[in-house]
Amino acid sequence: MKNWTWVLIAFCVSACQNNDQQTVVSGADISIQGINFIEQVNDQNADVVIPYSKYELDNGLTVILHQDTSDPLVHVDITYHVGSGREDLGKSGFAHFFEHMMFQGSDNVADEQHFKLVTEAGGTMNGSTNTDRTNYYQTVPANQLEKVLWLEADRMGFFLDAVTQEKFEVQRETVKNERGQRVDNRPYGQLNERVSEALYPQGHPYSWPVIGYMDDLDRADLNDLKAFFQRWYGPNNATLTIGGDIDKTATLALVQKYFGPISAGPQVEMPEKPSFEIDADRYISMEDNVHLSLIYMSYPTVSLRHKDEAPLDVLSSILGGGKTSLLYKNLVKTQIAVQASVSHPCAELACTFNFYALPHPASQKSLADIEQVIRDSLIEFEERGVEEDDLIKVKAGIESGSIFGLQSVSGKVSQLAANQTFSNNPNYIGEDIARYNAVTKEDVMRVYKKYIKDQHAVIMSVVPKGQLSAIAASDNFVPPARSTGENNAVASNAIAADKKKDNFDRSKIPTAGVNKAVDVPSMWESSLDNGISILGAQSSETPTTSMLLKIPAGHYYSSKDKAGTAQLLAAMLNESTTERSAEEMSNALEKLGSSISIYAGNHYMNINISSLTKNLDATLLLAYEKLRQPAFVESEFERLKNNSIQGAINNKKDAGYLASTAYRQLLNQDNIAGISGSGNEETLSNISLGDIKDFYSRHLKPANGQLIVVSDLGQAETSQSLSLFKAWEGSGEKLSLSIPQPDTKLGVIYLVNKDDAAQSAIRIGKRSLKEDITGEFYKASLMNFPLGGAFNSRINLNLREDKGYTYGARSYFSGDKLSGSYTASAEVRADATDKSIIEFVNEIKTYAERGISDEELDFLRSAINQKDALKYETPRAKLGFLAQILEHNLTPGFVDERSEIVATITKDEINALATKHLNINEMLMVVVGDAKTLRPQLEALGYEVIDYDI
């Protein structure tokens, strides 16, 4: 099923009503002064529903509670109905900028303390902004709920006076770094921005990017930001959603205590949906630092939850949703294009129907040729019509996506919050399923004729620099010059915080209650006679089954000169079998709502299987067919190989890829470990179909395989379903590989050139420890935690929060059974490359010489040992836990052993590990950026600078 089905579940896109599928209790179940009961929905008489209770505070704050006692954790989401679409002309990027500022402290929460307190509590947190909303969310152990509510309330009601010019300037630089990393320094990064400028009329809320224009942010001042907060961040424009192991009465009392005194903000209406049309195709183009050209066609359609959204989604699936789609058949399978797809993303005010394709250089087809194939495919669709299987696949995907979306508390809370924000009805999930199930063939043809056939689009060509002649057609449209709007200055005396007195001391951090015990998943063991070891766990929260089959046949089993063989085999196993074509296999899986993905890691060929349990046996038959009966079709191999080569060439345009590639090569030198599992242009060119068949026959055998299962079925029923694998026999060749220490020169900078790069990619590190679960590797990872392993680590706080050089910086130990490494990394502003290296080196040296502080040790212990509540919640999390046990031959007791290590490790032990493993003179540095600018700066630091080519 195409990704949009998961997206619509994640954002709870819904329309037609089906009130028979819910039970609404009209009476108040809890009475607390200042809180008004709205409704309660239970899970009776409905196939898919998220039970909840809904309330409203006197100040307008909407509160939604969802109880789920299966794990001792809570997820808290506060969504403000403001995104970039609420911004004024000339003040783009404010919503996203403000998201950053909301982590900079408030009256009673010090700068950077929000991250510290949540991390210390064993939780995770983040925020996000899109065109229509901004949300902040935390998942924490259940005993930490009050602390999170205190934190969120403090930045809602007590933020303004804590904002300083210094914080403002640092976060402005951080946003610029984020734009550099995600937009300006990324291939095709400006595509969506340019298309939106051409598609929407000037002043339309979607005509500017969410991240904003830098000149708008440069013009902004502190008062502008404060005014934005006062306009949009009132409780009456917010939804607070809390889910997990909660007591509703106690939770509501806490909500009233912390949020009740906050004054309502200005009234907020639902945004208008401005209508617009384009009266002719608009051709636009740009040159970019890319290898492959790209064509992108965007048609305006409807808006979120419009009655035609669902049939348009079905249409997008038919035209470009995977191997059964028309674009795949006409462009990808024919090797005219490396990639081609269709999507129909929807937002609150508008949706777009988008086609894109990247021509394959070997086809010698122009973007104009590709555009014609797309238009011919539309004609083919009109002649073909809508088939019954098209609707069956969509409905199966909706059902499975909905059920899989209920596996985590965070997923359920996110759906409730989004549904409330955009429809004033948290219970939209059932209605969403209903409207997709109601789509008919006639609906799909109707929306095709209304929104696509003979309609006009923005047609964007992105071509490599110097190849402007390759665009699909000459530009015939120029967006109007951007207006800065009235840009009226906001007077400082026009902004005043409205603070009401509390009957408690808000400055005191709430203390946590007793940490609830976390049960390690109970598990069962088994094996098949063919040598596959099985480890399973029963999870009855959803009627689903997830499996991971690991066969010792990964990247390290390939020869160095043919690196990429294992990954190409994995791709071939996802193609045709002797019984079905690739399209028929994809069709069969989509009709079941199941997925089978195969990929090669370093040590294992991994087969991931997800299915509704009712379809498990049918899904396993297809998985078995993929593994045992690959067709190895020559044309499919050539297509996959050629596409992989083009991908390897295109990757060289990405600074992060170049840095990681150079770093890997330097740490491993003449060894298969020095080459990515996907191979490179040279090694991929060496691989033949015969090599793939040979690798398959020598290595893809069941002996020593590992199968991990998480299902609502018990051991007996699961074992019965797995019985078909008994007929698979054989032993693969043993891995014979060592990864010796390289003789790479250390203490120097290896410089990889990327002309005119807006950012530089930095990697600093060395070969280090092999992975172990409770030994020195684990203890070294603990040692690194306060240095570079958390958001509020020394490295990130320095380079991001204090200096504004980067969007994020980190350090970590990584390893497997053969080798390991220590790495510090970041993408930084090009003009701060040398200064960033100075700060990296200073932080690493200082930590190695002076060690950890008492406060950092306390933080480490609390953060690591309270994470257990979050470790085993979802089937995916359980799969990872069981896979770790099976691969390393552990018992569940290793969890307690790790906890004991965290609780008892001393400062002296940590400091000794830092001294041993963080000697900066034993490390090498890789810098990717504009060499002509960077070389003199780096040499001025006193390092030898060595040019390095990839």
Where are the model-predicted features located?
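C-terminal motif of bacterial Sec signal peptides marking the signal peptidase cleavage site
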Residues: C12-A15
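M16 family metallopeptidases and their MPP-like homologs
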Residues: H66, D71-E87, G93-F97, E112-F158, ...
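Sec-dependent signal peptide recognition
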Residues: K2-I9
